[in-house]
């Protein structure tokens, strides 16, 4: 089995890099450390890129510090600096070239303000061909609870496949960290109540770790995450095309805005 390829996104205008810290922690916990590709670039939709912003001026020492850290940890890595205007497309292009298995980005935004990500980051989540891990500053070193959010009521085959991906990746994360694994499924009314027995047989889990609750997904998932003190929540966000691709506020985006944990988004 070949090594996993992890693409770690660095914002050079920041002094702290939660995505890098989490990637190093995870790499050292794995039986075989992954190859890591450090993508250094500025998201112009999230940062003031004018000449008046002092954060846009940096010296090569910052990049050297990142490389020194990787060398100190003994991790295999490559690095690139990107000047392209379209951050999201450049990142996806780099991921394709590097044959990325997972992208790790930092989340510096305050979800209480109601705007958690820039348009380019939303586009990344919708269009990435691999899981995207969104890391909050100050995340716990050891993950104790992994929560996977699924939607078993969806009839579309793509959503059923997505549910399977979320469950598989959630179990993988829980095994890696030695954490408890929980599943949450929201439903809107009794006509759409998921069958607990069928769900338990499908995912092969204890009943007390499967949470089926009525309500809006963003409320049900965020409340379950708080009650369980989840360290990471896995959600699905299928790519959209045409007019829908330009719209904000779909279910996964509302869920992300409500959560105050690390999040792994899968397509």
Show which residues each predicted segment covers.
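Charged docking surfaces used in two-component/phosphorelay signaling
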Residues: 81-90, 215-217
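Glycine-centered short loops/turns at secondary-structure junctions
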Residues: 31-33, 74, 99, 178, ...
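Small/aliphatic-rich secondary-structure junction motif
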Residues: 1-53, 142-207
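General small-molecule cofactor/ligand-binding pocket signal
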Residues: 37-39, 78-82, 133, 182-184, ...
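Glycine/small-residue-rich hydrophobic helix-like segments
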Residues: 185-235
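Gly/Ser-rich helix-loop-strand patches that form or flank binding pockets
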Residues: 95-142, 225-267
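A short helix-to-beta-strand connector/capping loop
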Residues: 70-78, 179, 203-209
């Amino acid at each position: 089995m070949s090594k996993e390829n992890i693409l770690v996104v660095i914002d050079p205008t920041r002094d702290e890099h939660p995505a890098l810290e989490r990637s190093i922690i995870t790499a050292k916990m794995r039986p075989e450390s992954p190859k890591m590709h450090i993508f250094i670039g500025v998201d112009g939709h999230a940062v003031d890129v004018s000449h008046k912003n002092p954060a846009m001026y940096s010296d090569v020492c910052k990049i050297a510090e990142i490389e020194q850290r990787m060398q100190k940890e003994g991790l295999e890595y490559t690095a690139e600096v990107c000047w392209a205007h379209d951050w999201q497309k450049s990142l996806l292009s780099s991921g394709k070239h590097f044959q990325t298995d997972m992208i790790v980005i930092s989340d510096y935004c305050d979800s209480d303000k109601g705007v958690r990500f820039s348009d380019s980051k939303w586009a990344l989540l919708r269009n990435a061909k691999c899981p995207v891990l969104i890391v909050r500053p100050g995340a716990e070193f050891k993950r104790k609870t992994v929560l996977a959010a699924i939607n078993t009521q969806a009839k579309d085959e793509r959503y059923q496949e997505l549910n399977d991906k979320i469950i598989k990746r959630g179990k993988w994360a829980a095994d890696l960290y030695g954490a408890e694994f929980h599943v949450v499924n929201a439903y809107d009314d009794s006509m759409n109540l998921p069958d607990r027995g069928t769900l338990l047989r499908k995912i092969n889990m204890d009943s007390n770790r499967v949470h089926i609750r009525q309500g809006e997904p963003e409320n049900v998932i965020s409340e379950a995450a708080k009650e369980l003190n989840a360290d990471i929540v896995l959600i699905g966000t299928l790519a959209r095309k045409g007019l829908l691709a330009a719209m904000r506020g779909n279910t996964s985006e509302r869920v992300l805005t409500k959560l105050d944990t690390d999040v792994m988004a899968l397509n």
